Curated annotation (Swiss-Prot):
It comes from Homo sapiens (Human). The chain crosses the membrane at residues 21-40, 76-98, 127-149, 188-210. This is Gap junction beta-5 protein. Pfam families: Connexin (PF00029). A connexon is composed of a hexamer of connexins. One of its GO terms (biological process) is epidermis development. Gene3D superfamilies: Gap junction channel protein cysteine-rich domain. Keywords: Cell junction, Cell membrane, Gap junction, Membrane, Transmembrane, Transmembrane helix. Signal peptide: none annotated. It comes from the Eukaryota. One gap junction consists of a cluster of closely packed pairs of transmembrane channels, the connexons, through which materials of low MW diffuse from one cell to a neighboring cell.
Length: 273
């Protein structure tokens, strides 16, 4: 594995995340990915070999193991971590796409032409929706996998002994699980970290939506103030002052704010794409 590429992806995800997103990223890669890589394979490496049943009937142990462990914990966690981390990489790819588009625009129209994005990494327009959808997807994946784990293993606990009566077992046999206490501790740790990640995703989602609503209300308030000061529709001077002070917020697409004839482009200070 090329760790330099991996480090670059992590730094990109961290750069374009909020404070809640950075905490989530640290929690995932320190308390979930690293713990999984260091511990999970060792704890579950001998689960099938050491699954003993008090019978010599050929095939009985294999059938009972498949009945009580339809999907391995390790495989489920691996799939969960892959699905949880991919949306964050999509945000980085979206920013990279914006930067490429901005570069091509400058090459085609010159350095003095208008910019497509005032800040390609700022969460505005399509990038805002990409980030929000990634939060919803990550929380949904963790919730779905917690439900799957609970369905396969009630209360996420493995009993030390299970009773099996599946064919070809001659009767009800007792089967013994290897290292149940260690596996239970590790399982509960992974469940707890997944629950904390879900909470962080929901808090970050609420933060982003409330921030966007606040910006929309501020923009409408600014427009209402301009209309109140100029009841006859002559609002250009008011908009000029708002542009100079950086208070007027433009919502919607990634286009530039309208340029006014008596002010140069350099005075436009804040634009929401």
């Amino acid at each position: 594995m090329n760790w330099s590429i991996f480090e670059g992806l992590l730094s990109g995800v961290n750069k374009y995340s909020t404070a809640f997103g950075r905490i989530w990223l640290s929690l995932v890669f320190i308390f979930r990915v690293l713990v999984y890589l260091v511990t999970a394979e060792r704890v579950w490496s001998d689960d099938h070999k050491d699954f003993d049943c008090n019978t010599r009937q050929p095939g009985c142990s294999n059938v009972c193991f498949d009945e009580f462990f339809p999907v391995s914990h390790v495989r489920l966690w691996a799939l969960q971590l892959i699905l949880v981390t991919c949306p964050s990489l999509l945000v980085v790819m979206h920013v990279a796409y914006r930067e490429v588009q901005e570069k091509r625009h400058r090459e085609a129209h010159g350095e003095n032409s208008g910019r497509l994005y005032l800040n390609p990494g700022k969460k505005r327009g399509g990038l805002w929706w990409t980030y929000v959808c990634s939060l919803v997807f990550k929380a949904s994946v963790d919730i779905a996998f917690l439900y799957v784990f609970h369905s396969f293993y009630p209360k996420y606990i493995l009993p030390p002994v299970v009773k099996c009566h599946a064919d070809p077992c001659p009767n009800i046999v007792d089967c013994f699980i290897s290292k149940p206490s260690e596996k239970n501790i590790f399982t509960l740790f992974m469940v707890a970290t997944a629950a904390i990640c879900i909470l962080l995703n929901l808090v970050e989602l609420i933060y982003l939506v409330s921030k966007r609503c606040h910006e929309c209300l501020a923009a409408r308030k600014a427009q209402a103030m301009c209309t109140g000061h100029h009841p006859h529709g002559t609002t250009s001077s008011c908009k000029q002052d708002d542009l100079l002070s950086g208070d007027l917020i433009f919502l919607g697409s990634d286009s530039h704010p309208p340029l006014l004839p008596d002010r140069p482009r350099d005075h436009v200070k804040k634009t929401i794409l």
